[in-house]
């Protein structure tokens, strides 16, 4: 009902007892159902009041240069990051974005992170960062904002981002990163970031939960 929009954001969710009575299930099943809805970010519990449908949708403006952390703060959400892996590479990294092939000169650092909002995983990101421009970045706290690290530790500010957004389905091994059991729609974002004319600082290949994200763009004539 929540996914279909029958219960809009802010609507009260049936209590455990109401679920038991309506669907003729056990206490354990009803409790587990509510727990799963909360874990997946669909509902939120308010002490003394009950459980309500959560407005989990985040809007990301793709014509602005700003990161996940700022996006979540502006949306009134609490951001968090978990570093799940990194590797160092000496070779170049190539990526095709919007029909153009770009090359990130080696050596570079490859990192994998899960990004959370209010404790719910919204994005799995892969980043490929130039070690020539950001030496020893793998020794930094990579659970912080990368844009903040670029600016504070290296004096680097992004000047341009070229991105491509495509529709995919979260399934298989990807589901565990989002604490999900069933396939859901998602967005794949591939991008290349510049910090000067033709100077590539990083590349991205990330997956966003499609049921919790909207992408917005503004064009002026």
Residue ranges and their predicted role:
Residues 1, 71, 149, 153:
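Solvent-exposed, charged/polar functional surfaces in cytosolic regulatory/catalytic domains
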Residues 48, 56, 218:
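Surface loops and adjacent helix of pleckstrin homology
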Residues 24-25, 59, 137:
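Residue-level marker of alpha-helix boundaries and capping positions
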Residues 1-53:
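N-terminal helix-turn-helix
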Residues 66, 79-221:
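C-terminal all-alpha effector/ligand-binding and dimerization domain
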Residues 39, 45, 61, 66-74, ...:
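Extended, compositionally biased flexible segments
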Residues 15, 52-65:
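Short, cationic-aromatic polyanion-contact patches
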């Amino acid at each position: 009902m929540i996914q279909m929009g029958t219960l809009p954001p802010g609507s009260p969710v049936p209590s455990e007892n109401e679920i038991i009575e309506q669907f003729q299930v056990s206490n354990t099943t009803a409790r587990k159902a509510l727990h799963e809805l909360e874990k997946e970010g669909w509902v939120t519990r308010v002490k003394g009041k009950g459980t309500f449908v959560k407005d989990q949708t985040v809007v990301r403006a793709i014509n602005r240069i700003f990161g996940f952390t700022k996006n979540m703060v502006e949306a009134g959400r609490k951001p968090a990051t978990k570093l799940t892996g990194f590797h160092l590479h000496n070779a170049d990294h190539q990526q095709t974005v919007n029909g153009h092939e770009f090359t990130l000169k080696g050596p570079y650092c490859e990192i994998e992170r899960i990004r959370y909002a209010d404790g719910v995983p919204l994005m799995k990101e892969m980043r490929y960062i130039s070690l020539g421009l950001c030496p020893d970045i793998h020794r930094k706290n990579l659970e912080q904002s990368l844009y903040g690290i670029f600016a504070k530790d290296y004096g680097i500010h992004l000047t341009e981002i070229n991105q491509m957004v495509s529709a995919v389905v979260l399934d298989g091994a990807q589901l565990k990163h989002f604490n999900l059991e069933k396939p859901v729609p998602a967005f794949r974002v591939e991008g290349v970031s510049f910090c000067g004319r033709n100077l590539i600082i990083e590349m991205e290949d990330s997956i966003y939960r499609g049921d919790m994200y909207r992408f917005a763009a503004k064009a002026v004539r």
